[in-house]
Each structure stands twice: as structure tokens, then as C-alpha cells.
């Protein structure tokens, strides 16, 4: 497919750019429409910056709303809400998206020296703790479990999803 046929644009999320996809923070629950098996996915895109032609972008917005509404009817919320839904769509319809490097969505607290668009820190504008709540301290066992969960468990889930041949059905109807 020619790059001109790609009517939508998404930007890679800086912390996951160039990383093995099994470490991307996709929704892996299997309950949400946004769920992506460990054996699938290539890019992790930021939910805060996307675009495209007017018609294609409006169709994308409608599809994201439809998927989110289906999840809500089933009492499910995707891990990172609309960002998770967008990542599932990128995985399902890769030919529709032009994927830009993270230079177009660089957080101001992580300058790279060649950022094209700088994203401002939320906490400068709103009180994030009042919205999300304060982080709870973790004990030794919780910290070790978190490290295992982030660094080693994805390999086991990848093996499981590969053996079970879990895949994403690719679609061209967005």
C-alpha cells in the first residue's frame, strides 16, 4: 500500500518507541474491544495526538465511540480508555495509518533535542492527584511482584498467545 493511501495519522508513544511489543502497555484483559494479545501489535501510539483527512478522522472518532460504548454496555473500561481503543485500531488496520516517530509528541519533561511538537505537563494546568488520587506506597513484596510483572511475565504471556495462535483479525473497513 502506498503511503498516500494512508488517510489517518498516529504518533508513537516515546517510552515504548523501539521496544519489544510484548512490553507495550496494551489492554491485555481479553474483555475489552481494545484488547490485544501478546503475540500481536507493532506500535504503541499516543492517544493525545492523532489526525487524518476530515472524512477518515470523523470515521475514526465514530468507531472509537462505538467501541467504547460497547465496552461500557458490558461494564468494561479499556486500560487506557480511548488510547487503548486507538491502539487496537492501529493493530487491526495498519494500512490506514501513517505512523509518525515520537518527535511529534514529546513530553516537555523528556526533551530529546529534536522534538517537533512538545506536549505540556498536565500537572502545570490541573491538580492531577485530585483527579487520579495519590499513589499508594508499596511494600517489598509488592515492588518485587511489580518488577516481575513488568519484566518477565510478558514472555510467558507471549508464549501462551503464540501457542494458542491468538491473533487480531485485520480489517480494511475503517
PLM features: residue spans?
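Short, small-residue-biased leader/transition segments that mark boundaries at the very start
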Residues: 1-3
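Positively charged, low-complexity intrinsically disordered regions
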Residues: 5-7, 168
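Short beta-strand-to-loop element that shapes/binds the nucleotide-sugar donor at the catalytic cleft/hinge
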Residues: 7-33
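Generic structural signal of hydrophobic/aromatic residues within well-ordered alpha-helices
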Residues: 34, 61-64, 68, 144, ...
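Catalytic core and acceptor-binding pocket of nucleotide-sugar-dependent glycosyltransferases
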Residues: 36-126
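C-terminal catalytic/acceptor-binding lobe
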Residues: 88-174
